[in-house]
């Protein structure tokens, strides 16, 4: 969701979404404002790919989630079984947001997230158990804005995660 000095704009809901079996297949320029995502699927956010029909859900209460997918080789995850998901959504900021600092708050993204706003890269976060917060003030404008997210199933930080939950 968005948060700024007590004002919030929730971005939960249906997002445009494209899932890729490998990171090599992903669209290189999906974050651009002129990119045509009309053929994309949609997905609820917050939500999990695996619980929405993408990839394979894995439940682990002992050991690592990637067991059987790739060998331990910290900090490098295997590229051959590393899914990618790309998300897009527009939102509108009216005059009441003018002059305010605007932050994007992502409660969780497994296992990492890269963020673009209006075609410009904002930042990257790599820890699915912690929230990510990005100052997007200089990237937003009055009126319609585009936010784009890219998430990989595995990343270097994946080696630090081993808990009892669905992945």
Predicted regions mapped to residue ranges:
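N-terminal pre-domain segments of enzymes
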Residues: 1-26
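Ser/Thr- (and often Asn-) enriched beta-sheet segments in non-cytosolic proteins
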Residues: 10, 42-44, 90-92
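Hydrophobic residues on conserved beta-strands that form the core of alpha/beta folds
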Residues: 11-12, 37, 87-88
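Accessory beta-strand-rich segments of carbohydrate-active enzymes
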Residues: 17-21, 26, 48-51, 55-56, ...
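Short Gly/aromatic-enriched secondary-structure transition segments
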Residues: 26-38, 43
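Short, low-complexity, polar/charged sequence segments that are solvent-exposed and flexible
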Residues: 34-37, 61-62, 122-124, 166-167
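Surface-exposed, low-complexity/disordered Ser/Thr/Gly/Pro/Asn-rich loops and linkers
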Residues: 52-78
């Amino acid at each position: 969701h968005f948060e700024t000095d007590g004002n919030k704009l929730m971005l939960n809901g249906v997002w445009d979404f494209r899932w890729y079996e490998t990171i090599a297949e992903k669209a290189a320029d999906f974050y651009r404002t002129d990119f045509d995502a009309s053929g994309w699927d949609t997905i609820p956010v917050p939500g999990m790919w695996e619980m929405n029909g993408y990839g394979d859900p894995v439940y682990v209460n002992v050991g690592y989630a990637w067991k059987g997918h790739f060998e331990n080789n910290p900090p490098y995850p295997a590229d051959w079984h590393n899914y990618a998901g790309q998300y897009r959504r527009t939102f509108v900021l009216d005059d009441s947001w003018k002059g305010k600092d605007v932050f994007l708050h992502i409660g969780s993204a497994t296992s990492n997230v890269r963020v673009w706003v209006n075609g410009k890269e904002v930042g990257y976060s790599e820890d699915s158990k912690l929230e990510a917060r990005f100052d997007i003030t200089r990237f937003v404008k009055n009126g319609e804005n585009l936010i784009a997210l890219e998430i990989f199933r595995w990343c270097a930080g994946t080696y630090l995660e081993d808990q009892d939950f669905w992945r």
